[in-house]
UniProtKB/Swiss-Prot annotation:
Its cofactor is Mg(2+); Mn(2+). This is Inosine/xanthosine triphosphatase. Phosphatase that hydrolyzes non-canonical purine nucleotides such as XTP and ITP to their respective diphosphate derivatives. Probably excludes non-canonical purines from DNA/RNA precursor pool, thus preventing their incorporation into DNA/RNA and avoiding chromosomal lesions. Gene3D superfamilies: 3.90.950.10. Its EC number is 3.6.1.73. Pfam families: NTPase_I-T. Keywords: Hydrolase, Magnesium, Manganese, Metal-binding, Nucleotide metabolism, Nucleotide-binding. Belongs to the YjjX NTPase family. Binds 1 divalent metal cation per subunit; can use either Mg(2+) or Mn(2+). NCBIfam families: inosine/xanthosine triphosphatase, PRK05074.1. Substrate binds at residues 71-72. Mg(2+) binds at residue 71.
Amino acid sequence: MQQNIIKVIVGSKNPVKINAAANAMALLFPDYEIQTQGMDAPSGVPAQPMTDSDTRQGAINRVHYCQQQIEADYYFAMEGGVDCFEFGPATFAYIAIAHQARLSIGRGALLPLPMQVYQALEAGEELGHVMDRLFNTVNIKQKGGAIGLLTHGHATRESNYTQAIILAMAPFLNPELYP
């Protein structure tokens, strides 16, 4: 018996993002072989998005770029960003998923950031570099991320992306409810 295949392109070569996409799709489609491939995709926004809207647009831009480059069943993009809300600074990620002619946008959980971290970001640094310096780690953005460090490993960047992907997949899982 030949197994059905779902091909997924992720707009990044970051293993955290690729693994999150693969894990989410395996949970959603357990009877399918999930083929996940990452590719470099420009976000068209600053390397460290500092607003909600730039972060969302970065994910959308990455998905659209991937759609123009290669054929797949699904296209995923995850863009991490930061903003200062009424309750203080926080980091979060937007998820953009394209399938056929439909685009779904989701967002991961908000992680409150220490003010000293936010101030370093305002000065032009990227979150991963700030966290590496603060916690004496190396390339944390391709591991547990700020989420893993600040929650003592109880949550990770990958777990946040995985959950956000599953939620953003709702329109594709229930197309009759999302005309």
